[in-house]
A protein has these predicted regions:
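C-terminal accessory regions of radical SAM enzymes
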Residues: 114, 154-172
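Conserved AdoMet/S-adenosylmethionine-binding subsite of the radical SAM
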Residues: 1-148, 156
């Protein structure tokens, strides 16, 4: 908190790894930040059980939640669960947290038009004002698929704009 005053910071963003693996740390820091009138931002995969998520939400001012795809099969490939992430996005929107969603498009995995249309429609059912960031994938670590063509990102963004007002292309 002392450094914040020197730097003029308005709060803390928990990001660049999955912050919720340290749930108690994030919760305790967010509580302290809230007590001092500072903002808490989460950049998360949104994969957390409902009860701790609901306990954390009143302490969070904004969240960017990864919606990694829109099929159960894709989430199984990732060893996650689509319905848990969708529920957590919905709950965050319902409590009035500023929510933005990011989808990293991976060629041959989650780059289908039908999936993006379903995702955009579902997000718009929560709010057509919900920002969606559609990001381009680049090969890293063990996943050696080719990078997402820029044209694919722009095409999927154009599809999403049929339902959402704020769609942004990333990593292009």
């Amino acid at each position: 908190l002392e450094y914040r005053e020197k730097a003029g910071s308005i709060g803390v963003a928990f990001t660049y790894n999955e912050p919720l693996v340290g749930y108690e740390y994030v919760r305790d820091c967010a509580r302290l930040l809230k007590e001092h009138g500072l903002a808490t931002v989460l950049v998360t995969n949104g994969f957390l059980c409902r009860k701790p998520w609901e306990a954390l939400l009143p302490l969070v001012d904004a969240a960017n939640i990864d919606l990694k795809g829109f099929t159960p099969e894709f989430y199984q490939w990732l060893q996650g669960d689509l319905e848990t992430v969708k529920t957590n996005i919905r709950l965050a929107v319902e409590v009035g947290c500023h929510v933005e969603v990011t989808t990293l498009v991976i060629p041959g995995k989650n780059d289908g038009e039908e999936d993006m249309e379903k995702e955009a429609r579902w997000l718009a059912s929560l709010s057509p004002d919900l920002p969606l960031h559609i990001s381009r994938y680049f090969p890293r670590w063990h996943l050696d698929l080719p990078p997402t063509p820029v044209e694919t990102v722009y095409h999927l963004a154009a599809l999403a704009r049929k339902w959402l007002k704020y769609v942004y292309e990333g990593n292009c």
